[in-house]
C-alpha cells in the first residue's frame, strides 16, 4: 500500500507541472514507476475539461496518455447512454479503451461487457471500475474480432468505436480502413445483437457509410463546443 500511496502523493504534488520537464528531472528513491506516474499527470491534464468527474476522483488511473486523448467526453458518453444504455439490458463495448463509455452504459444497463486487447488497459479498467463501484461490468482481454468469432453469448446491443489512426498515426476516414472493419463484421455482429451503435469520424462520408452499412436506422451528428 505504501507504493500506491506514494504514487498518488507524487501525482498530486506535481499535478500542475509540465510533464515534459518532469521527464527530464531526476528523482531519488522512488518505489514506483516514474514514467507511469508522469503519464498519470499528463493524462489528468488532458482530461480535466472533458472528464471533470473522473478528474475529481484522485484514485483513478490511466493506462496511457493516448487513452486519455482518445477517450469519449462525459457529455458524449452520456449522450450514447441515452441512445442505448437505458433501452437494453446487456451491452457489449467492443473497443473498451479507457472505459468511459462502458462506465456510463453500466449506469442504466444491467450488464456491460468491456472488450480490450491490451492487458494493461484491462487491468486498469478492472481497477477503475472497482474504485467507481461498478460491479456490473465484465472485463475481457481479447481482440474484438477474436471475441466475436468465439463468443456464443448474445447481447442486446454492441457499441464499437473503431481506431481511426494507422500505424503511422495518420487519420483514417473510410470505415473499411479503420480497425476493426465494421463493414466486414456487420453481418456477424447482427447475428449476435439486434443493435449496433457505431462511432465514426466527423469527416466521414455519411452517404457512402449508409450505403456500405446494412440496415442503418439513425445517423446522429454530434458537436460539443463546435467540435
Map each language-model feature to its residues.
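SAM-dependent transferase fold signal centered on methyltransferase-like domains
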Residues: 1-227
Amino acid at each position: 500500500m505504501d507504493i500506491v500511496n506514494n504514487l498518488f502523493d507524487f501525482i498530486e504534488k506535481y499535478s500542475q507541472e509540465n510533464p515534459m520537464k518532469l521527464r527530464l528531472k531526476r528523482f531519488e528513491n522512488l518505489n514506483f514507476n516514474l514514467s507511469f506516474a508522469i503519464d498519470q499527470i499528463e493524462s489528468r491534464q488532458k482530461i480535466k475539461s472533458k472528464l471533470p468527474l473522473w478528474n475529481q476522483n484522485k484514485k483513478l488511473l490511466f493506462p496511457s496518455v493516448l487513452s486519455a486523448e482518445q477517450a469519449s467526453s462525459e457529455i458524449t458518453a452520456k449522450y450514447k447512454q441515452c441512445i442505448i444504455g437505458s433501452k437494453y439490458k446487456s451491452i457489449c463495448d467492443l473497443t473498451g479503451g479507457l472505459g468511459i463509455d462502458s462506465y456510463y452504459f453500466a449506469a442504466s444497463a444491467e450488464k456491460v461487457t468491456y472488450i480490450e486487447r491490451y492487458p494493461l488497459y484491462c487491468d486498469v479498467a478492472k481497477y477503475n471500475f472497482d474504485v467507481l463501484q461498478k460491479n456490473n461490468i465484465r472485463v475481457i482481454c481479447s481482440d474484438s474480432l477474436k471475441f466475436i468469432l468465439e463468443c456464443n453469448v448474445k447481447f442486446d446491443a454492441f457499441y464499437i468505436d473503431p481506431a481511426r489512426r494507422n500505424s503511422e498515426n495518420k487519420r483514417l476516414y473510410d470505415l473499411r480502413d479503420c480497425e476493426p472493419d465494421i463493414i466486414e463484421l456487420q453481418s456477424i455482429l447482427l447475428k449476435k445483437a439486434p443493435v449496433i451503435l457505431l462511432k465514426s469520424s466527423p469527416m466521414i462520408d455519411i452517404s457512402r457509410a449508409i450505403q456500405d452499412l446494412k440496415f442503418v436506422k439513425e445517423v446522429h451528428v454530434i458537436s460539443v463546443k463546435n467540435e
